């Protein structure tokens, strides 16, 4: 009677993998959390809201150099889907006209962007008389200008094409803003969004040397 012999397991049998080291597990968890945070951030700035920086004072006194304004991105998507349209008084930002000088980075990102105020839309006529903007012959109140007028600016009657917007900077001084007076009406589908709230800097020094809260809606 033979004696049973114990033979080693066949080499084809798969051995249990060694458990990952604590350091490797920690690294994997860290990378996963960063990836999830990046995806959430991209979704927020694409569909919820982002900010746009103000360079120069062409929109003074409403927006000042160095400030940042909140842009509700859901409004942009609503406009692209035909659920809303940009209207007179909206402060919008868009890609600068094609003749604007661009750096290599701006060519890659689609910039530079400019921010102006809508004063008329497609089918409307814009005039300047006695320093006042008239749309279809009706003077516009423009309370956000604090009494400033286009006294030194002449503008012949302009009929805004359908699907376009006539935009102006709030700084109406000579050479204060390069806007539709220089490059004409802009296509409405180039609008990237509406500036709704000034969110940076949160506080600002006033002319008397004191500090005041700078968070405010864009007029």
Predicted regions and their residues:
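Extended hydrophobic leader/signal-anchor segments used for secretion and membrane insertion
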Residues: 1-219
